Structure formats: structure tokens, C-alpha cells
Amino acid sequence: MYFLGLLSLLVLPSKAFKTNFPDETIAELSVNVYNQLRAAREDENILFCPLSIAIAMGMIELGAHGTTLKEIRHSLGFDSLKNGEEFTFLKDLSDMATTEESHYVLNMANSLYVQNGFHVSEKFLQLVKKYFKAEVENIDFSQSAAVATHINKWVENHTNNMIKDFVSSRDFSALTHLVLINAIYFKGNWKSQFRPENTRTFSFTKDDETEVQIPMMYQQGEFYYGEFSDGSNEAGGIYQVLEIPYEGDEISMMIVLSRQEVPLVTLEPLVKASLINEWANSVKKQKVEVYLPRFTVEQEIDLKDVLKGLGITEVFSRSADLTAMSDNKELYLAKAFHKAFLEVNEEGSEAAAASGMIAISRMAVLYPQVIVDHPFFFLVRNRRTGTVLFMGRVMHPEAMNTSGHDFEEL
């Protein structure tokens, strides 16, 4: 399985933590960003990396003063901390992401591109290196095509060539002074892998009741599972939560699935940081039959409107105060865009096409079944720290190539 997150911030000229960091801060940010995206994308897939967003905005925060600083701290949930304490926490997260781990790969990289001859505070550069290990490079943004090629190559190198063409020459001009880029790459194998020979073509029913044929993986095994009430008295008021761990047990994917007759949009307003914590603490390990789509989702998001919706507005205006970054008082944040890629398959990483002969049936159900054949919400989290690495929903699964057979009995 691959998860990739990439966030880029363009600044243009104009007029196990060492800190007592609130456990739910990143989860709160995740939910807030998710709510902004679902309001703007009524019937679309959603995929983003809240950790990537938090760290990239943390780099911008290092350069901010005044109201600009206050807005960023408040919107990211840092108000309860002493000024600057959040950077130690973000550094801890970044260090965790880049620590070599035998069971999975989780890498994070940060890069700062500065216009040739443009003065950036030495203190800012030191802090960016200290907290985020950012690469700092001088570049000529007036050579927009060459800059785009150079940055895209950097992105490809830090996402195992999974994210390509992230920026274009149109994103840069002679007026561009500073670009911050953050990339996160995760590759993990399921602790209990799906056997490719069990994958079959299956109908996925969308919220508008249309159907699409997708490859559906299957296995019966021990997973963390629970059933929860949405608070209604209706028959469909119970939804399922399935947590599937990756090798090493530290990282897991959590699937949240409403009953088929209940649209996902009915369940989404319930999602809160506290509820995510409740799911994690309440699911119990038990034998479960799992039917999970094999799919990919790739999405690019213009975060400018999202961040504005969270209350981060001044940094995008001519009144922005980024004087901790540069003595040039004419800087403001012009663009903020984010790209993420998700691939789910049998191994967790790339797997060969299936061509099995095993038939699967709902007959004689002995264990709970999780049949993910309609829209669902998901998140990938660190089970030890609770940090949400990726969050999203699948409304329209983009099927990967498969040579499986139909479920004749389903």
C-alpha cells in the first residue's frame, strides 16, 4: 500500500513527545480540514495528509509575526501552548516520520527554495533546519520551466516516483520569492495480507444508487472491529468500524462504514476528534470477514480556500506579516496546494493481478462481515501516538486492473 502526501506553499512579494502537546490536536485539524473539503466536494473522493499540512504551515508560522502568527496558531490548535512549544512537537513528528522502521517506510522531506539574491533571515533558516530539517536552495524563479522541472524531480525522488508533475511553469514567475514544499511517503504491508486469488469483480453501489464494477479483496481473519450508534432510532443507525493493522502494528487503517441504505453524508457530521479516539479505544480484536475494494485515489487540492475557512486569512493578503522570515515587508502567501495518492491492494504494496478460483459466499455467516461495497470514510493513524497521517473518503473507487471472477452468489 502506498500513501503519499505533498503540500506546496508559494510566497510572493506584495504590499512520543517532549512537549505536553494536546493528544487530539492533529485529529482536530484533520476533522476541520475534512469538513471544509466535504462542504466543497459534495460527491467526490477526498484524500489529504493532515500531518503534511500541519508541518508545512508550521514552517510558515516560524516566519510569522503579529496577527498573521496568531491566526495560524489558533487555526492549528496551538493556543494552549506557550509560543514556540508547538515546533518541538512538530519536530518530534517529523523525526518519527523519518526514523527507519523495518516493518514499513514512512519518510518526510521538507524543502525551501529561495530566489537568487533574495534575503531570508538567517535565524529563520536556522530554525527551519533545526525543527524541520529542511533543504534550503537558491533558485531563479524567472526560469519557470526549469524551476518546475527541478522541483518536480525533487518531489518524485521523495515520493518514490509516485507523485509526478506536481507543479508547472505557470506556478512561478519573476515575482516568486520563496517556495516551501513538504512531502510525506508511506508504504506498508498489511499484517495479514489478502490473498490475490480471492479477489473477484464486485458491484460497488454509489450514493446515487448507480453501480460500478471493482475488484473486491477478501479474507477472514482477526481484526479490530466494533459497531457504533449514530444516535438515531432508525434501523440503519448502526455503523461499523474496522481497523486493519500494517506489519509492526504501529500503523493502521481504519474503515468507517454506514449501513448500505444510509448515505455516507449522513454519518460524516458525527466525525469528531473525540469520536476517532473513541473508535480506537472501543474496537475489539475478533474474527471478521472482510470484503475490501482494491482501488486507487489521487487528488490535488487547492488549500487556499480550505485554510481561509479555518481562519487563516491574513497570510494570504497584502497585510501579511512574515517579517520573521524576511525583512522584506511585502511578502504574502500566494498559493497553497496539496496532492496525495492512495493505493490499496492485497499485499498493502503493489501486487500482481489476481486470477484465482476460490468462490466466496455470504452463506452460513459465523462472524461479523464488513462488506465495503458502498461509500466509506477512512483514516490512517499511528496507533501509539494517535497521530492521523491520512484521512479521506471513497465515493467513486478507481479500480485497478484485475482478472478476477464475479461473485456468483452475491
UniProtKB/Swiss-Prot annotation:
Q: Where is the signal peptide?
A: 1-16
Task: Name one molecular function that GO assigns to this entry.
Answer: serine-type endopeptidase inhibitor activity
Keyword check for Signal, yes or no: yes
Q: In which tissues is it expressed?
A: Detected in embryonic ocular vitreous fluid (at protein level). In the embryo present in retina, brain, cerebellum and spinal cord. In adult, predominantly expressed in the brain.
The site feature described as Reactive bond is recorded at: 362-363
Its domain of life reads Eukaryota
**A GO-annotated cellular component:** extracellular space
KW Isomerase (keyword) present: no
Explain the purpose of this protein.
Serine protease inhibitor that inhibits plasminogen activators and plasmin but not thrombin. May be involved in the formation or reorganization of synaptic connections as well as for synaptic plasticity in the adult nervous system. May protect neurons from cell damage by tissue-type plasminogen activator.
Q: Where in the cell is it found?
A: Secreted; Cytoplasmic vesicle, Secretory vesicle lumen; Perikaryon
What Pfam families does the annotation carry?
Answer: Serpin (PF00079)
Q: What is its main location?
A: secreted
Protein's name according to its UniProt entry:
Neuroserpin
Q: Which InterPro entries match?
A: Serpin_CS, Serpin_dom, Serpin_fam, Serpin_sf, Serpin_sf_1, Serpin_sf_2
**Which PANTHER family does the record match to this protein?**
NEUROSERPIN (PTHR11461:SF50), SERINE PROTEASE INHIBITOR, SERPIN (PTHR11461)
Q: Which keywords has UniProt assigned to this entry?
A: Cytoplasmic vesicle, Glycoprotein, Protease inhibitor, Secreted, Serine protease inhibitor, Signal
Family assignment from sequence similarity = Belongs to the serpin family.
Residues the record marks as carrying a glycan: 157, 401
